[in-house]
Each structure stands twice: as structure tokens, then as C-alpha cells.
Amino acid sequence: MQQGRPHANSSIVNGKNKNLILGSFVRNLSIRVTEFSPYLCSGFKNKTKMRPYIICHMMASLDGRIDCEMTEQIDDTNHYYEALTQLGCPSTLEGKTTLAMHYAQDGVFQQQRPHEDAGQQLYKAVEAASYAIGVDTRGTLLWDDNTTEIFGRPLLMILSERASQEYLDYLKSKHISYITAGCNGIDLPSAMETLRAVFNVERLAVVGGGNINGSMLDLGLIDEVSMMYGYGIDGRGGMAAAFDGRPMDRKPVRLTFKSVEEQDGIIWARYQVNK
């Protein structure tokens, strides 16, 4: 639900250290740690277990659907973005589908070399007060040279350790920061710890789509839900909901009401997630 295409500079510092902890990482860091066999598929280890405070902030129709073309028709104002500013979350996180729809180039990354798993790595291309964070499990999105920022915030991609080394080299050539965590999909808890410890992300807004929202909720990573309901109903079958993809055996996630307000016919409701 965001746009913008300036660009960022970067610099690189290489390093390897088998006793490495996140608190000792320095700025502009590029590290490969596949030799850490105990940690190979569990992400970088942060002894403090700290992560950002995470708010899921969404605009939806009254029936909870979030298709962007639809929501733009039921809120043609800036209420969504004004509310996001009020939440005090300068960094945002979006799923691959949303990124592909709004920001990435058409097509997918084509490997030219035999596949080599990236393993655990991170690359900090630029020091910034906030980041536009994206999830791309296997590393397939293509980026224009001028799209290293979204809304003036540098891109930071989260991938699995099964992403190819060639793709990470591609991101680095674009001066795009990245984190790899997890072998069987992305280890989101570990990635969130890295965001806090290395990239200094203290408050994070998850802004869709439904699958990344659902995954974060299912893992207990959402602290607060901020829902804005536009004055319309979608009603079309098969359209994404604000939270999608949780296993069928899961129980509902209980919430505690925080506040509600009306803004020109739009309802903004906030809830704390019960832990």
C-alpha cells in the first residue's frame, strides 16, 4: 500500500567470527556464517531475545477484505497513512505478493550459475532511521536500479537460507540490505530479533498482505492490531482477508480492545493481542 522510488548509497565491511553475537555487529556489515553448524538453520542468535514492538496496520472493507484496488475505492484519502504515522512505526514490513504488485519489476530472477544455498548471512547496505522491509523467501523479486528505497526508506529484504548466493550477490549489487534466516521457510522470530539488534528497529508496522499478517500472528509476533474499515463491502469470493493462511486447527487469537475513532466515515479500531 505504499509507493516511492528514490535511492540509497552503501558501503561494505566484511567479517567472520565464530564467537559473533548480534550486539557486537558494526555498521555496514556483510557476514556469511554457514560454518556455524549449530546455528545453520535457526537464524542469527540474539542472546537478549529482543524484537521490535509489532503492530499490524491494515485498511479493509467491512467484510475484512484488503484488495488494494478495492480499498482505494472506499478510502480515497490519506487516512491510512496518517494513522500509520500516529502509530509511531517508521519501519514497515510487507509480504512478497504486495511487493511484486506495487514495487518490484515484472518477471523473476533467473539464475545463471548452479544453485548454492546462501546459508546465514546479513548485509547492511546503509545506516538508516527506518527501513522498508520485505519478505521474499526464495529470492525471486527483481528491482530497478532506482528502487532501493520506498517512501524514502531503504529496502531491507528478509529471505530464507535456501535463497541462492547468486541472488544475494544481485541484491548487494543494488545496495539492498538483507537478512537470511531459516531453512524450511523464513525463521521470522529470528529475523525480528536481527531487525532489533542490528538494524535498530524498535517499532515495526506489518502492512500486508494477508499471508504475512497471518504468519506473524500465528507465531505470536503481533503485539497490536490496528484496523481501519472503509465505508464499503467487497463481497467477492476468493479475495484476501486481513489475516490469511493460519492452519485449520488453530483457535481464534483473542484481543483486548484499546480504542476506536471515526474519521470521515472510516472506523479506526485498535486492539492489543492477548499473549
What residue spans do the PLM features occupy?
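Cationic, low-complexity basic patches in intrinsically disordered or flexible, solvent-exposed regions
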Residues: 3, 36
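Short hydrophobic alpha-helical segments enriched in small aliphatic residues
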Residues: 8, 15-18, 26
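Short hydrophobic targeting helices and cationic amphipathic motifs
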Residues: 20-22, 29, 40
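Short Gly/Ser/Thr- and charged-rich N-terminal loops/segments
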Residues: 32-33, 43
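Enzymes that bind and transform nitrogen-containing heteroaromatic metabolites
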Residues: 43-275
